[in-house]
């Protein structure tokens, strides 16, 4: 969404950067458009596409070859950092690879009307994965007295925007803007994945960016406040620019009957055999039969989030169980999102409900289908202990739903009055918040008033509302001494 928003700015030329998170792109880079050698250039770019998805090595021999390559490449990269050599950005033209660019990077979040715009853009490729850049610094920390990061050749660009603290050194003429989403790896390190690595990687890159004079575009005032607790000296370099929410989420007419079809077709199928109850053919058949046979109105609560400790799924399930036992035994719970980390205890707790066809864990739900789920849910619930922004509440507002959320600073900031708040540490408080939201939904006049408020607040997070802030900020950074 950010890239599409930036493409709409008229006063600057925007180039996209293609980079992997965890695995390097090992194909040979193309460094300039070569009109005289089209076949060779297309072949080279085709190999880059392959490298994004597959390194081509199979079986035991492939594993050995891969391991040797990783060791040799690691030695070479460490030497290049010590020598101060820069990594060049490759050139990538999407004109012959439109399907790859669209479906891999944009199709899940952008409407198809945006396809021509993102495919007309220019792209560069950074072959080193973000994880590689972090590990290079970490692996050299014991060898060098001063922490060093890999240099990246960016002299063709005035401004470089990174979606995380950037573990690299840009060319001297290029100014860095860090899109800062949250300080959770620092303030809630017990909730993150691969804690030691991600905590150290986040802090070290962030500290390097601060020292180098980087600017920070924080996704919320709450995130900016956390950042300034750590580095108060960057107050003048840190601004708030909220996230842009996809225009796919809008209030349209859709029959509630679609919900059962969406639920039955998107049932989660985990790889772990331990949780086969979530995906066995027996469970699938039972769930679909239960959905088809149930003549009652399909009433459900909705939560959209990866399953991980910070998101507070366990408390929500406990609250839902109380609601069922006290007030409405027919109330279902729909959870949309993949299994992240530290989820075993939670999954063990929900398996009986899944087997009974009362709780539904969904994955790979397309944005238009998610829009329908938001619209018809009794309440969309955002129970996290901490967030940087939290898209799901705004998406629900835009889609015509009602939102109940944990009473944390970022929710108060982003959702304002278009939300019912509860204490995320109290199951009884969650129950009370959900009941209040359901009552609001069921009262036509109150619901209409709520919807007017939700439309007004969610309109702040459209591209039309956010793009002027980016324009102003980038222009100011570009003109800064």
Over which residues does each language-model region extend?
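Carbohydrate transferase catalytic cores enriched for Leloir-type hexosyltransferases
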Residues: 1-481
């Amino acid at each position: 969404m950010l890239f599409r928003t930036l493409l709409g700015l008229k006063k600057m030329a925007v180039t996209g950067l293609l980079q992997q998170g965890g695995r390097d792109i090992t194909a040979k880079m193309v460094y300039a458009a070569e009109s005289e050698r089209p076949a060779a250039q297309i072949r080279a770019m085709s190999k880059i596409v392959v490298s994004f998805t597959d390194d081509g090595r199979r079986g035991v021999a492939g594993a050995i070859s891969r391991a040797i390559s990783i060791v040799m490449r690691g030695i070479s990269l460490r030497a290049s950092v010590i020598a101060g050599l820069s990594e060049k950005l490759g050139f990538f033209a999407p004109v012959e690879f439109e399907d790859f660019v669209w479906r891999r990077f944009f199709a899940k979040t952008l409407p198809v009307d945006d396809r021509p715009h993102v495919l007309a853009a220019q792209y560069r490729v950074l072959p080193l994965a973000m994880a590689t850049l972090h590990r290079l610094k970490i692996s050299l920390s014991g060898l060098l007295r001063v922490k060093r990061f890999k240099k990246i050749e960016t002299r063709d660009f005035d401004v470089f925007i990174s979606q995380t603290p950037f573990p690299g050194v840009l060319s001297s003429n290029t100014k860095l803007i860090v899109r800062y989403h949250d300080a959770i790896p620092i303030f809630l390190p017990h909730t993150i994945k691969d804690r030691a690595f991600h905590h150290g990687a986040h802090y070290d890159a962030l500290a390097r960016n601060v020292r180098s004079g980087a600017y920070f575009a924080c996704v919320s005032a709450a995130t900016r406040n956390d950042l300034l607790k750590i580095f108060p000296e960057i107050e003048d370099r840190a601004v708030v620019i909220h996230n842009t929410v996809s225009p796919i989420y809008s209030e349209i007419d859709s029959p509630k009957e679609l919900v059962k079809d969406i639920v039955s077709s998107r049932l989660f199928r985990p790889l772990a055999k331990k949780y086969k109850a979530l995906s066995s053919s027996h469970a699938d058949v039972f769930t679909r039969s239960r959905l088809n046979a149930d003549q009652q109105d399909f009433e459900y609560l909705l939560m959209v989030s990866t399953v991980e400790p910070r998101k507070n799924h366990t408390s929500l399930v406990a609250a839902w169980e109380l609601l069922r036992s006290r007030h409405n035994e027919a109330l279902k719970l729909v959870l949309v999102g993949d299994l992240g980390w530290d989820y075993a205890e939670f999954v063990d707790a929900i398996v009986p409900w899944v087997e009974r066809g009362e709780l539904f864990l969904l994955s790979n739900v397309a944005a238009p289908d998610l829009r329908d789920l938001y619209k018809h849910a009794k309440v969309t619930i955002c129970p996290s202990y901490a967030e940087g922004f939290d898209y799901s509440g705004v998406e629900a507002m835009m889609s015509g739903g009602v939102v109940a959320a944990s009473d944390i600073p970022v929710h108060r900031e982003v959702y304002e009055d278009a939300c019912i708040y509860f204490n995320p540490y109290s199951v009884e408080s969650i129950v009370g918040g959900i009941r209040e939201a359901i009552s609001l939904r069921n009262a036509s006049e109150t619901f209409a008033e709520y919807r007017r408020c939700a439309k007004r607040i969610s309109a702040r997070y459209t591209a039309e509302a956010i793009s002027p802030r980016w324009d102003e900020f980038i222009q100011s950074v570009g003109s800064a001494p």
